[in-house]
Amino acid sequence: MKKILLLFVCLFVCWVLSAQQRIKVACVGNSITYGTGLSDRATQSYPVKLQKLLGERYEVENFGKPGATLLNQGHRPYTRQEEYRKALDFAGDIVVIHLGINDTDPRNWPNYRDFFVKDYLKLIDTFREANPAVRIIIARMTPIADRHIRFLSGTRDWHGEIQTAIETVARYAGIQLIDFHEPLYPYPYLLPDAVHPAAEGAAIMARTVYSAITGDYGGLKLSPLYTDNMILQRDTPLKVHGIANAGEQVTVCIDRQRWITKAAPDGKWSVKLSPLKAGGPYTLTISTPHRILKYTNVLIGEVWLCSGQSNMEFMLRQTITGKKDIPQAADEQLRLYDMKARWRTDAVQWDASVLDSLNHLQYYKETEWEICTPANAAHFSAIAYYFGQMLRDSLKVPVGLICNAIG
């Protein structure tokens, strides 16, 4: 019996210590943080989603106040709200601040803009006083869509000015800056009322904060343009860039070049290759301690983007001379990256699944760099193909053609 009691006491003590060691995250903000506009903010707001992503080691609390301004002389200053006092009492180990949207109101920014940086720095100081070891993260604001009633009467411009002020605050305070604007801006449908993100948008915000806190950006990733058989531009410094987990060492190797960099806190990294002469084939290797990406049969030469509508999309097999030219199309040093449209832009009604895909910017089918053959040249842009052949004949270097035409 004593052993059972002792075991119970030990388990209880471990549970208490575990609870005490949870990392507290305070989400400070306005109605967007609060979850206004969501059908069920108790399950859909970004702090709730963040809690699920971070797991039991973290305790996330929502201190969003609808209508709150950062400006202390604004129409509803956050620092005068009960949510602010609760956030201070919470004394979070991490404080994530997303304020500024309501400061675009004509009652606020035109009159008190000069106080914004000062007021923001003061707000940060109060959280540092509540917990001297606190980690502060501030966010560039979510977008405001052009459907907003005041968008053209000042809101658009003031929104941009406030973004710049927020960046200034981050530099002065020496704190981490995250971006809620970039991941939401391409998706206006995620802002149904032009201001408040829908549930999917809130999930994107949560993922942004999760990555900022943990440094987890999903590991080493590059653009789909990087594949075997690709061509890189000759005779110019070449930027190679991608995503990795924050702080990870990234090594880029090609030919006799070897470059090492580290992923920034936002996961982004880049290196600039020294100019390469036309030739190859080479292997481009990009690696972190946890992943290696190797691209083979890479050539250095001329790279051209062939974009447009139906005239550019018009395929080689549709030309009068296609039957004669297609059998002669094989060329190991001509490479094609053919981006075919997922759906035709004909006068037909698209169903809901197509519209959903388009809303998610899924315009093109997946593709990769290919060596030019009669089979793939037949379905490639005729204009682009003949242009590429002309370059091959005159320059005597490898040529890469990227076609993203949609008729």
Residue ranges and their predicted role:
Residues 1, 20, 52, 56, ...:
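Alpha-helical cap/lid subdomain in secreted, periplasmic
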Residues 1-21:
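Bacterial Sec-dependent N-terminal signal peptides
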Residues 21-27, 32-121, 157, 276, ...:
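Conserved SGNH/GDSL esterase-like catalytic core that processes O-acyl groups on lipids
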Residues 217-222:
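Proline/serine/threonine-rich low-complexity linkers at boundaries of modular beta-sandwich domains
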Residues 228, 236-240:
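Structural beta-strand segments of beta-rich domains
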Residues 241-324:
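Extended acidic/polar, glycine-enriched regions
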Residues 310-377:
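Secondary-structure boundary elements
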